[in-house]
Design a protein with these regions (language model features):
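Short, basic amphipathic alpha-helical segments that act as recognition/interaction helices
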Residues: 27-49, 53
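Short Lys/Arg-rich basic patches
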Residues: 1-11
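Short alpha-helical "recognition helix" segments of helix-turn-helix
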Residues: 20, 86-89
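Surface-exposed, Lys/Arg-rich phosphate-binding patches that contact polyanionic backbones
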Residues: 11-29
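Short, amphipathic alpha-helical "recognition" segments used to contact nucleic acids or chromatin
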Residues: 66-81
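Intrinsically disordered, low-complexity basic tails/linkers immediately adjacent to helix-turn-helix/homeobox/MYB/SANT
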Residues: 60-63, 116-149
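Short, basic interhelical loop/turn and adjoining N-cap
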Residues: 27-29, 42, 91-100
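Short Lys/Arg-enriched helix C-cap and helix-to-coil transition segments
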Residues: 48-52, 111-123
Length: 149
């Protein structure tokens, strides 16, 4: 369910909102763009270690102080059984920001799980998107040699 909210905003802000909506494309309207930005702003207020940014796949939440989208943080955190302190020992990010990413995931699990799933395209799907894509294997021996110079 939704409600109508009437706001009086400066003309310059309307122009900026229209420009933002055009940049997003896909039939984005001023109203949809405004609602999206309001939702993002509320989420950033509720989760201090999170910020929304433009990315090649659209706007998505990132962990502040990093180049990692929340779905990427969660993929890593799963390797640490979602233990922010353990993860912080191996990664150069404040434990508070890692915790914020995990809390954000707890609140928006379905959305983040969908982003993780979207990232796991198979080779055939990738080939359709990137026709020049070539698949090759690196022998395990070479991987070990590079890991232990």
């Amino acid at each position: 369910m939704s409600q109508i909210l009437s706001l009086r905003v400066p003309d310059q802000m309307i122009q900026r909102l229209d420009r933002f909506a055009r940049r997003l494309g896909n039939g984005m309207t001023r109203t949809k763009a405004g609602v999206m930005l309001l939702e993002e702003s509320l989420r950033e207020t509720e989760f201090a270690g999170i910020e929304y940014r433009d990315s090649p796949v659209g706007r998505q939440p990132y962990m502040k102080g990093s180049g990692l989208a929340i779905w990427e943080v969660i993929l890593i955190a799963r390797q640490y059984d979602m233990d922010a302190e353990r993860m912080a020992r191996d990664y150069p990010y404040p434990v508070e920001n890692i915790k914020a990413a995990i809390y954000f995931y707890d609140a928006y699990r379905e959305e983040i799980d969908q982003a993780i799933e979207d990232n796991h395209l198979g080779y055939e799907a990738m080939k359709r998107l990137l026709p020049n894509l070539r698949l090759f294997e690196v022998p395990k021996e070479e991987m070990r040699e590079e890991a232990n110079p």
